[in-house]
Amino acid sequence: MLFRSSAHAELPSELTLRWSRRIGAGDDKRHQIAAAPVAQDGQIYTIDSHSMVTALDETGTILWQRELGKSTDALKDASGGGLAVHGTQLFVTTGFGTVVALDTSSGAWLWTQDLASYGGASPTVYENLLYIAARDGAAWAIDTSNGRIKWQVAGPTVAASHTGGPGPAVSDKYAVFPFGSGDVLASFRKGGLRSWNSGLSGARLRLASTQVRDLTGQPVIEGSSVYLASSVGRMAAVDLNTGLRIWTAKHGSQGHILLAGRAVFAVSDTSNLIRLSKDDGTLIWSTPLPKFTKKSLKLRAKIHAHFGPILAGERLILASSDGLIRQFNPSDGTLLSTVELPAGAASAPIVVNGTLYVLNTRGDLLAFR
């Protein structure tokens, strides 16, 4: 079976590292790279762990850089950030609670909006509005031309959430906002009037990580349904117009979910690459992934992060913090091949014009062809 979807991209079966370019600061004890690169018209945009934005061309040449950090004190305490590109504007959210619009060709500062809220979640652009769900439980629609707030809605209070965070999903009628509490809110996208809200409750017993009940991936809208996943063992399909549950599966997600054909793919919260039926949430297959960074039972405090999956070249691709790109058969989950990374992955990969780009924990953008 061939998998074709809007997420599908062409990519050679054999991947070789073509170039590597330092784009700023990598991960450290206080800061993490929290956003995948974005691309448009032959340019790739990144944000490092200290809110440095970089634009590069497809040869790895740095075109411009812009430091968005407010101050030394802000950089000490804030991490995360998100990117979205549309037309001649690059939109950036920061961990300091600001949203910035930059000119894509020069990096010139166009406008800034201070949301006075914990930011860092990825923004979503639809027509002339920028939609943001802050990590502390608020949501905004911002005019892309001048940065003015068009409307705002208050979401649930959030005690704890993951760094960065997913962006809203937007259709012609609705904006669907994910929050760190595990709740989702749908508003009419033009005026902000609430339509419905829902939550993904769940638990993984004896796991401290389940104290953070975050929606870990961007909601995915397809037709009249929206697909959601949490960090605590729940995935669901919901009617976009009513918020009523279509199905629920006892599988969470570490990050974004991927829809392709009649399938839903994700890296589960228990570190398995899984495929579910999009129709009813039935588990089709599950492939175990490396989980703990230490083999000793006493040292199992940290787990490997697996970013993705994406679908390219008719195969599923993950980039992982253990320093490997893994490629899988989407039909049965078989591991097809691995490619070594210089240092662990820090973001989901993207594919542009037959090249795979991924950030590593050192702050390097890597290009594979």
PLM segments and residue spans:
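Short loop/turn segments that connect beta-strands within beta-propeller blades
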Residues: 57-61, 103-107, 143-147, 188-192, ...
